[in-house]
């Protein structure tokens, strides 16, 4: 999607950008990638398969996806990421940040994930936590919106209902985490 458009501009020979997609979006995503030569160095794989050959990838990044993976699927994707990364390879995560103590069902319905949960799953799958950043923090986000994170921009699921209020909050409060595969 959007991040693939950004990152594809920075991939040069012999590099490859591997874009992993869920099966639901695969056909439309492939069509988009085929429509522009800018995406010529983009390889598309399914999230439910091996992401890449073992120990072959320098870095993996995921933006605002963890809430879609909550449960066993998250373990599976983190495990596949660990296998694909070279020793010392990095795994960057940006995700809507839930308040500490938020339970799994509330995370699923709101789209916000606790930092503790993201870190726990990463550590359980062999990653080391290298760094955290507040670059995507938003203290205006109260995280108690009627349609969860999707109430805020860019989605604005309530359409014009309290639109000005939600636009003034801005995008969600997000955690930014950096993990590494041990050497």
Regions found by a protein language model. Name each.
Residues 142-183:
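Core SAM-dependent methyltransferase catalytic element
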């Amino acid at each position: 999607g959007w991040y693939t458009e950004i990152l594809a501009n920075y991939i040069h020979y012999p590099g490859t950008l591997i874009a992993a997609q869920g099966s639901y979006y695969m056909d439309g995503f492939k069509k988009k990638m085929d429509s522009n030569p800018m995406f010529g160095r983009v390889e598309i794989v399914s999230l439910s398969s091996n992401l890449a050959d073992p120990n072959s990838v320098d870095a993996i990044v995921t933006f605002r996806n963890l809430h879609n993976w909550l449960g066993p699927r998250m373990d599976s994707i983190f495990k596949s990421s660990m296998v694909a990364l070279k020793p010392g390879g990095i795994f960057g995560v940006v995700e809507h940040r839930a308040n500490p103590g938020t339970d799994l069902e509330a995370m699923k319905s709101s789209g916000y994930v606790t930092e503790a949960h993201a870190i726990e799953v990463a550590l359980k799958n062999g990653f080391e936590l290298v760094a955290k950043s507040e670059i995507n923090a938003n203290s205006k986000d109260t995280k108690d919106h009627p349609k969860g994170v999707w109430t805020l921009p860019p989605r604005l699921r309530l359409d014009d209902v309290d639109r000005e209020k939600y636009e003034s909050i801005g995008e969600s409060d997000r955690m930014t985490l950096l993990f590494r595969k041990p050497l």
